[in-house]
Amino acid sequence: LGNTDAGETITAPPPAGVDVGVPVTLGERVVNLADPGGFRYLKTEIVLSLHVPGVVGSELSTEELEKQQATLNARLEPIKPQIQDILTSVLTAKTVAEVTTPEGKEALREQLIESLQPLLRQYQITGLYFAQFVIQ
């Protein structure tokens, strides 16, 4: 909606009925980037927003949201090794130059969604967020 005196941006909550998905963290990852010498690392935490049929994430109470997250985590547990493999494969193929620009991060986001979506057949990925993204 605007900026506060402290410089923080305030945004309005999504309109009622708009599905922002149910957020599910894929955990923290530390990987070597594909730079020559292999001395550059990426530490990231990725959060997916998943559309759950019949559920509008933005309308859930905190308790209902936690229940949905627990249910999703349990349903994703059998494919967690494949999810982790995709994350590792995609992230370790990137160089520092490819992931340091806003355009590079957006391309990485799109590639991860394209790579993960076939595995998550019954859930549409509505967003992928880098809760943490540190290059060293």
Please give the residue ranges for each predicted region.
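Flexible, low-complexity charged segments
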Residues: L1-Q136
